[in-house]
C-alpha cells in the first residue's frame, strides 16, 4: 500500500478498494468531482462572507454550494469504487477536499460570530485527533468506520448547512438542536474510536507476547 493510499485509508476509515491507480486514468469523472469540490471551497467562502456575511441571498448561494459539494463527495466515492475509477491521486485528494470543506465552513461561521469557536475547535480537534490515531495504527490494520461515524458525518453536514442559511426564530432553534446532536455524535464517536483502537492494539500486543 502506497503512502498516499495509507493516508486516504487512515482518514476515511475505509479499507483499500481493489488495485488503486495504475489502471485508472487520473482525469476521470470521480477525480473531476473531487477537484470540483476543492475548487468550490473558496467560492463558498466568498458567498458566505459577501456583504459582511449578512447578505441573505448570498448565504443561500453559499448553502447551495456547500450542499452541492457534499453531494459530490457521495458520488465520487461511488464512482471510484464501482466503476474502476480509483486512483492514488483521488485517494489522496478526496479526504483533503472533505476536511477542507468542513473546516472552512466551521471556521468561516465562527469568524462571522454565527457559531461559537468552542464548537469549531471541538469538531476539528476530534477530526484531527482521530486522523492522527488512524495513521498511527494503520500498519496494524484498518479500524472501519462505525455506523455512528457515518451518522456523525451526515448530521454534521446538515447542521453546518443549516447554520449557513440565514435562519431565524424557530428555524434557528432547529439548527441549534441539530448542531447539538452533531456535537454529541462527534464526542461519542471520537471516544468510541479511541477505545476500539486501544482495544485492538492491546489485543495485538497480547497475541505477540
From Swiss-Prot:
Chief location: membrane
Residues passing through the membrane, by range: 32-52, 105-125, 147-167, 171-191
Enzyme category, top tier: transferase
CC per GO annotation: peptidoglycan-based cell wall; plasma membrane
Pathway: Lipid metabolism; phospholipid metabolism
GO molecular function: CDP-diacylglycerol-glycerol-3-phosphate 3-phosphatidyltransferase activity
InterPro entries from the UniProt entry: CDP-alcohol_PTase-I, CDP-OH_P_trans, CDP-OH_PTrfase_TM_dom, CDP_ALCOHOL_P_TRANSF_CS, Phosphatidylglycerol_P_synth
GO biological process annotation, one example: glycerophospholipid biosynthetic process
Annotated keywords: Cell membrane, Lipid biosynthesis, Lipid metabolism, Membrane, Phospholipid biosynthesis, Phospholipid metabolism, Transferase, Transmembrane, Transmembrane helix
Superkingdom of this protein's organism: Bacteria
EC numbers for this chain: 2.7.8.5
Catalytic activity, reaction form: a CDP-1,2-diacyl-sn-glycerol + sn-glycerol 3-phosphate = a 1,2-diacyl-sn-glycero-3-phospho-(1'-sn-glycero-3'-phosphate) + CMP + H(+)
Lipid bilayer topology: Multi-pass membrane protein
Role noted for this protein: Probably catalyzes the synthesis of phosphatidylglycerophosphate by transferring a phosphatidyl group from CDP-diacylglycerol to glycerol 3-phosphate.
Family: Belongs to the CDP-alcohol phosphatidyltransferase class-I family.
Protein name in UniProt: Probable phosphatidylglycerophosphate synthase
Phylogenetic classification of the source organism: Bacteria, Bacillati, Actinomycetota, Actinomycetes, Mycobacteriales
